[in-house]
């Protein structure tokens, strides 16, 4: 018989391996940039201008603001920086209350930083920075100085100082109050305008909230050097049970102490500037039941926000205290980062400014109410949302035993209204960002 042959063994083709390569993160793409002030192959440098010396409020402004900026830069640099460069503070200038313009002109003359951060009480240098095309990121408590200046980016957009708002009236309703007082300083035009705006807001929504204006005084002495006993007596006689002021936190303490002295400790106060945890803690139960509204998501919120977590964690890593001005600095630094990132790896001052001005819903990662920078440099007018926020929102917290807690659900800390109408309505609770 013929020999048989064995069929050759079959072999299995080797498995092919597919390797997926993630595209590089565009944030870290380095491209040469020449002729841009404050930018070299290693860093993007900024100046910080603010008030430290001669601060009449006695509060931490410049240094706390700087804490937030430096924390944000540390956070981003820890990720790898931006376009192959580290973000840095080149130098810090104390404007000593009256020298903001002098410091701005020094920065303009030196021409050695990319942009400027600004936290001051007298913003007379903002116009010079704007007119010289320098990206400026600011603690925007100055509606007039920020208006119509498209190179100035506040932690909030340009506001209408004289317009009515629903925040204080809604807080009056929450407090169950019926007789409202509005107080402000006579020496400060901003304070006087604020005081009138609050009164107008109560008048507008009086029938909706079941409360009315009972006392108005926009001529208080700055810092209440003579106390406030006569005014408190008048308010007591008028049955005032809710007081909104446009005064600083020290004056609020003086007011609260006098109310307690005259047996009016249960009167609810609406504070404009007392989102200051050490100050509130030191006051103990003096401010129990009072309200204050930060202009960003409160630290007390529990919304799972990535940027809020990054802020709190980075501040802790650096050994810095949480503060209102630190968060403002963080938000301003995020705007600067966003401007450059949006401009792309080959950038300059103008392209960064233009890129940020094209953002129609900038919210600093959900920390603030979304801003449309394509239109919100222009001062809004009453009843017209063309240049205003799409939503009117506030995120109040209430004081108790020296601590603070959100009024809304901590997961949705903002109360918001449709801003296309002035009609009264119950607000919706919401959260922004992620």
What are these regions (language model features)?
Residues 150-263, 301-302, 306:
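Extracellular/periplasmic Venus flytrap/periplasmic-binding protein
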